[in-house]
């Protein structure tokens, strides 16, 4: 067991160049790095894996509706864009208003835009 721990410490101490050389030597011996990834799969029953919940969302404005001016004002407040940029974003729908927002932030932005009369999607 001590030999394995020592080997582990030595592997962790390798520089990137040394790790690349080790990888090349292992490939010459027929051991591919991708093979280890293919072997590691979900264990157990035949059930489909549970869908992972996203933690980042893009808030996409899909339409301005009848109250375009209110939507432009809300887009300006959310993004900090100037009047022309906000107007171009609203008129160029579908466009992302906010990218990589947290779930709560994305839902708040969606609620604000929908209250202003816009149609919004979270992606």
UniProtKB/Swiss-Prot annotation:
Question: What Gene3D superfamilies does UniProt report for this protein, alphabetically?
Answer: 3.30.1390.10, Single helix bin (1.20.5.710)
Which keywords fit this entry according to its UniProt record?
Ribonucleoprotein, Ribosomal protein
Keyword Ribosomal protein assigned to the entry: answer is: yes
Q: Disulphide bridges in this chain? A: none
Any one GO CC term of the record: cytosolic large ribosomal subunit
Family indicated by similarity: Belongs to the bacterial ribosomal protein bL12 family.
State the protein's name.
Answer: Large ribosomal subunit protein bL12
Species of provenance: Maricaulis maris (strain MCS10)
């Amino acid at each position: 067991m001590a030999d394995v721990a020592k080997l582990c410490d030595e592997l962790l101490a390798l520089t990137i160049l040394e790790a690349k050389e080790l990888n090349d030597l292992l490939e010459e011996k027929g051991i591919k790095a991708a093979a280890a990834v293919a072997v590691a799969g979900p264990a157990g029953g035949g059930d489909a894996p549970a869908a992972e919940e996203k933690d980042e969302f893009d808030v996409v404005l899909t339409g301005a509706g009848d109250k375009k001016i209110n939507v432009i004002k809300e887009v300006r407040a959310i993004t900090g864009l100037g009047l022309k940029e906000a107007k171009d974003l609203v008129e160029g729908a579908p466009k992302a208003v906010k990218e990589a927002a947290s779930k709560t932030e994305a839902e708040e932005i969606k609620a604000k835009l929908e209250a202003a009369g816009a149609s919004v999607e979270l992606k």
